[in-house]
Amino acid sequence: MDGRYVLIVEDDALLRELLATALESWGYTVQTASNAADAKRLFKMSDPDGVILDVDLGPGLNGFDLAHILLESAPATAIVFLTNIPDSRFVEVDPDGLPTGIAYLRKSALSDLNLLASALDVTMRGEVTNELRHDRDKNRPFANLTKKQIEVLRLMSQGKSNAQIANIRGTSIKAVEDAIRRACEAIGVDNSVDGNTRTSAVAKYLSVTGLIKPSATVK
């Protein structure tokens, strides 16, 4: 393991330092970045063997965009996504468009950092299995949502009215109401005639999909 270089790209300062300390204790040489711009600069300077990438990096490029850019210049680089987002559909990225040979770990699914160490090592060796693809886990949060349901919930979370959603999707308001009803059922929100239904659905969607960031909980 000695001599392998890793770049950590994570905008949560506490988690970033926790990961760096752990990786250094395992013998890696580590550099860290809090945003895509710094990550691209450090990647060019250090030519790391692997990159641990958060997906939600704030304004600008997300982790998926950044991974494609980095792999264009160094295709053999190991990529480990470490994120609160269950799968790429929730940030409007087709799962089939993700780079091959990656690991995808949900922060909430890590009981300790040994899984991350194993994932990084396996990915560097080009031996990734489905066990390291949490985005393909059939039991992941909201795995049952369709593409349309995700789109409707996303637009609701942006404060769009039913009329606005209908206009964006090119459908009728009635079709939107039906899509919202089925989306609420899919995520376990009571769709009774209650003004809180929409608020509850949006809150649950944002929380479970990782689009509202909790505090760092990986130990």
Model region roles, listed by residue range:
Residues 32-50:
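Acidic, metal-coordinating helix/loop segments flanking the phosphotransfer/catalytic sites
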Residues 119-137:
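The C-terminal output helix
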Residues 54-56:
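Active-site residues of response regulator receiver
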Residues 12-31:
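Two-component/phosphorelay signaling modules centered on CheY-like receiver
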Residues 65, 85-106, 111-114:
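Alpha4 helix (beta4-alpha4-beta5 surface) of REC/receiver domains from two-component response regulators
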